[in-house]
């Protein structure tokens, strides 16, 4: 028994690195950041999307995480990417899930309608399995560390979103370690 217990302590979970074809998937998630908005320090919600093949990003700020912001974030992100992936990967947040969880979750009526209109499949992660959408989890941290430090001092949320779009455009010049092309070059290849 002791030997089995010792072996169990040494064995760790193994995860297969995820690999995606062009335009196969986008991962989406919410984050939170602090800004000085109109002279008042406050928390805002940051909407993050990452195209899984190219690594392209879309980030937008909202006052709250609700269904309207969720759907608007998806539409704006798809416009930014210039197309629709075959699937969008998200967690089990109430704004997207009517019932169930993980692979058995059922999308809310509005999210289902949006997915039908744009012809993508909504895919939900299993609970406590952050690695299933690790690309966008990394993006939330990246944006919080790089864009929101120091704390931005802006007049309006529209001004903040304009600066976030500029940040996304500059990110397209970034080269992801292990890739031969820049994010922007890979994004263009996704559109072909």
Question: What residue spans do the PLM features occupy?
Answer:
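Acidic/histidine-rich, metal-coordinating catalytic segments
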Residues: 84-103
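Active-site beta-loop-alpha junctions of metal-dependent nucleic acid enzymes
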Residues: 59-87
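Mobile-element integrase/transposase regions
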Residues: 2-57, 65-72
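Secondary-structure transition/capping motifs at alpha-helix termini
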Residues: 10, 52, 77-86, 117-121, ...
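Active-site-proximal acidic segments at structured loop/helix or strand boundaries
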Residues: 140-192
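Two-metal-ion acidic nuclease core segments, chiefly of the RNase H-like superfamily
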Residues: 104-122
